[in-house]
């Protein structure tokens, strides 16, 4: 222990680096592990140690049916320049269009095989919908063949969080509960629907409504009817790889909607989320259903005592409930959107969702907004969340009062166009022509910024440098570009969409691994999912990816899952990946696989 009461030099560290004179890092050939459409731009980026002065030709090899290889292109790699701590060269093989199996080679480095094919993106979203989202379903027993992923978790949700309390994982309760429940009291009705937010097990409302809206966008644009999962909410049971006659995407939309509806039914407004009461549960590794005893806490019982389906053990999760108008708006945007998708699959839930959305919108207009904020659990910027709600309500109801709100909020949205542009574009068909025309300057400015960002590194996407790596930023940028390309094709080209997807799939600094587990020849196999204790992965999960360790080291650990900033699955990125994979197949000129 360090001595107490001392000032000045108290401890000195002597660090002796263990280095190998003349060591050179082997080249990395960054490329899409999934492959490329025949007509697409195809660029591989070769990452070299800055002290590597050797030169070698880059080669593209075609793999025959018998495993033999034939060189189809040999060319000197074109120097791009230096970025971070490495030097970069590139091989453009866009002229190779013949479908088949290929590998890239530079010196002694050879990549895993990848495809050139018309349908290269067609099934890229299947693992995410087939496996990742079912495994993430809270309040359900999830089974896959002979494997139980987890039991019916959190049957004892949830207790009212204590007042004036700053909690773990960026949750906090303000000076009031804004509910009829006292701190520590059980709030009934919350043990239904929703997904584990990330590698851990909380229900973060902001993530829930982001996922619902993204899944609805996918449904409305492409209508994927894929059915490989059976969901029985009455039995609270999910069976992976067992069709049940209902499109899986609609089932996931319903599952998220159930949790959002439950919050309004329970307390009258959206809550921040539901999270474990202490650090011991927060660090829980294993089956989510073993985190708690599943029995509602009864303070009249002794610790460990169980009676009448209740328990004296206060292990129930806490609900953080201080009102935030931003969360209300974000949630009703998702409910309004979900009501469109669920009209046939569950008309009663669709009516309930839309009823809540219209009622809460009207209520919010009668008072000053509730502005409670803490961490990243109380919603996005208020005007952005309100704009999203207005857009979704307009799309659902066609009521002109929501068009008026959209128009009134547009100047604020224009100032943060990158954050709001997909909502802004979604409203175009329901707004006057002047609305679209007024958007053009912002679209041009955004397109110009995209070009500038693409030139900043050899991968052509914005690479973040914070403590959470940037896969989410890259996917969001690609979806932004897709929305603008479809609405303003003369201003925004499709290239940024492809660059974003290729970054996720292996065209990035540090390695050539796909950041979508199970998608691409080599993908993330050690990740921060709810099975991270096994040093394993969940197919279809998307990790944050490349973290830039200060000052210049691009890192993604494949040997240690617990670096959450590099390896933690989060549900919004999963939903966005499903959306982006569909967009890519659309741009490739072939309809996505159903």
PLM-predicted stretches and their roles:
Residues 247-271:
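Carboxylate/His-rich catalytic cores and anion/metal-binding grooves
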Residues 217-255, 313-319, 337-353:
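Short coil/linker segments at helix-helix boundaries
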Residues 410-416:
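Solenoid-like repeat scaffolds
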Residues 1-21, 584:
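Beta-strand-rich recognition/accessory modules
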Residues 114-115, 223-227, 265, 271-275, ...:
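Short, solvent-exposed loop/turn and secondary-structure capping segments
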Residues 322, 332-336, 341, 348-385, ...:
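Internal metal/ion-chelating core segments
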Residues 34, 42-112, 137-209, 213, ...:
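Aromatic (Trp/Tyr) and acidic
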Residues 20-41, 111-150:
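Low-complexity, Pro/Ser/Thr- and charge-rich linker/hinge segments at domain boundaries
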């Amino acid at each position: 222990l360090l001595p107490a009461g001392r000032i000045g030099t108290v401890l000195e560290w002597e660090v002796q680096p263990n280095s190998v004179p003349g060591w050179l890092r082997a080249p990395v050939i960054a490329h899409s592990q999934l492959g490329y459409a025949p007509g697409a731009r195809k660029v591989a980026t070769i990452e070299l140690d800055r002290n590597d002065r050797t030169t070698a030709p880059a080669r593209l090899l075609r793999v025959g049916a018998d495993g033999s290889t034939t060189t189809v292109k040999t060319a000197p790699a074109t120097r791009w320049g230096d970025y971070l701590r490495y030097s970069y060269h590139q091989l453009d093989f866009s002229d190779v269009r013949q479908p088949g199996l290929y590998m890239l080679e530079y010196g002694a480095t050879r990549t895993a095989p990848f495809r050139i094919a018309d349908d290269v993106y067609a099934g890229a979203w299947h693992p995410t919908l087939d496996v990742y989202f079912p495994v993430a379903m809270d309040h359900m027993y999830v089974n896959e063949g002979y494997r139980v992923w987890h039991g019916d978790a959190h049957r004892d949700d949830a207790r009212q969080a204590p007042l004036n309390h700053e909690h773990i994982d960026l949750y906090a309760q303000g000076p009031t509960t804004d509910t009829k429940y006292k701190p520590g009291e059980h709030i009934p009705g919350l043990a239904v629907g929703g997904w584990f937010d990330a590698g851990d097990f909380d229900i973060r409302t902001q993530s829930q409504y982001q996922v619902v809206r993204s899944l609805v966008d996918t449904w409305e644009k492409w209508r994927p009817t894929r059915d490989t999962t059976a969901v029985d909410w009455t039995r609270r049971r999910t069976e992976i790889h067992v069709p049940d006659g209902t499109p899986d995407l609609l089932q996931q939309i319903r599952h998220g909607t159930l949790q959002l509806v439950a919050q309004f039914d329970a307390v009258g407004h959206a809550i921040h989320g539901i999270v474990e009461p202490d650090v011991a549960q927060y660090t829980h590794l294993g089956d989510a259903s073993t985190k708690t005893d599943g029995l509602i806490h009864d303070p009249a019982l002794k610790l460990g005592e169980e009676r009448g389906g209740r328990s004296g053990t206060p292990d129930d999760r806490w609900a953080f409930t201080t009102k935030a108008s931003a969360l209300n708006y974000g949630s009703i945007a998702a409910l309004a959107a979900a009501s469109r998708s669920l009209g046939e699959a569950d008309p009663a839930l669709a009516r309930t969702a839309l009823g809540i959305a219209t009622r809460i919108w009207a209520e919010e207009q009668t008072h000053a907004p509730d502005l409670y904020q803490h961490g990243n659990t109380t919603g996005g910027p208020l005007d952005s969340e309100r704009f999203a709600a207005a857009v979704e309500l307009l799309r659902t109801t066609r009521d002109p009062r929501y068009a008026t709100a959209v128009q009134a909020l547009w100047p604020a949205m224009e100032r943060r166009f990158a954050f709001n542009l997909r909502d802004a574009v979604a409203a175009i068909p329901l707004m006057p022509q002047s609305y679209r025309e007024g958007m053009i300057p912002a679209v041009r400015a955004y397109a110009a910024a995209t070009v500038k960002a693409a030139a900043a590194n050899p991968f052509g996407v914005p690479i973040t440098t914070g403590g959470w790596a940037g896969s989410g930023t890259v996917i969001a940028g690609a979806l932004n570009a897709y929305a603008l390309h479809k609405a303003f094709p003369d201003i925004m080209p499709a290239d940024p969409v492809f660059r974003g997807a290729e970054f996720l799939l292996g065209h990035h600094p540090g390695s050539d691994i796909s950041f979508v587990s199970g998608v691409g020849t080599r993908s993330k196999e050690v990740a921060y999912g709810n099975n991270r204790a096994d040093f394993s992965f969940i197919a279809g999960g998307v990790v944050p990816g490349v973290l830039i360790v200060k000052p210049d080291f691009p890192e993604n650990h494949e040997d240690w899952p617990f670096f959450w900033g590099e390896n933690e699955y989060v549900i919004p990125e999963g939903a966005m990946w499903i959306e982006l994979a569909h967009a890519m197949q659309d741009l490739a000129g072939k309809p996505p696989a159903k």
